[in-house]
Amino acid sequence: MIRRGDVYLADLSPVQGSEQGGVRPVVIIQNDTGNKYSPTVIVAAITGRINKAKIPTHVEIEKKKYKLDKDSVILLEQIRTLDKKRLKEKLTFLSESKMIEVDNALDISLGLNNFDHHKS
């Protein structure tokens, strides 16, 4: 079963513009009820092109700890919904402490804790 925090290889093509594409690792960020019953999953792209977080929506993951080819960064500003058929092989899963970092970066990316544009 697909679980929140799992890292899979996924085919993200086709893409447009600045979207992350190709076959690459992604982390499942959807809740486990959705993962069980929905034909789709919500994921965040992972890149190995940078190995240090550049902005607050980035989370670093270490290659040795997570059995990746290289030190990588989860891009929580690059989230998308995929059909489960796009998921290839499961690579690993993230620790609870790493998922707390993911949740904090998601909060920033989605503006969940500072919704104030209706204030006058």
From Swiss-Prot:
Superkingdom of source: Bacteria
MF (Gene Ontology): DNA binding; RNA binding; RNA endonuclease activity
Pfam families for this protein: PemK_toxin
GO BP terms, alphabetized: mRNA catabolic process; rRNA catabolic process
InterPro entries: PemK-like, Plasmid_toxin/cell-grow_inhib
Assigned keywords, A-Z: Endonuclease, Hydrolase, Nuclease, RNA-binding, Toxin-antitoxin system
EC class: hydrolase
The protein's Enzyme Commission number: 3.1.-.-
Similarity-based family: Belongs to the PemK/MazF family.
Subunit and partners: Forms a complex with MazE which is no longer active as an endoribonuclease.
Function statement: Toxic component of a type II toxin-antitoxin (TA) system. Ribosome-independent, sequence-specific endoribonuclease that cleaves mRNA, thus inhibiting protein synthesis and inducing bacterial stasis. It cuts between the first and nucleotides of 5'-UACAU-3' in single-stranded RNA. Neutralized by coexpression with cognate antitoxin MazE.
Name of the protein: Endoribonuclease MazF
Organism: Staphylococcus epidermidis (strain ATCC 35984 / DSM 28319 / BCRC 17069 / CCUG 31568 / BM 3577 / RP62A)
Lineage: Bacteria, Bacillati, Bacillota, Bacilli, Bacillales
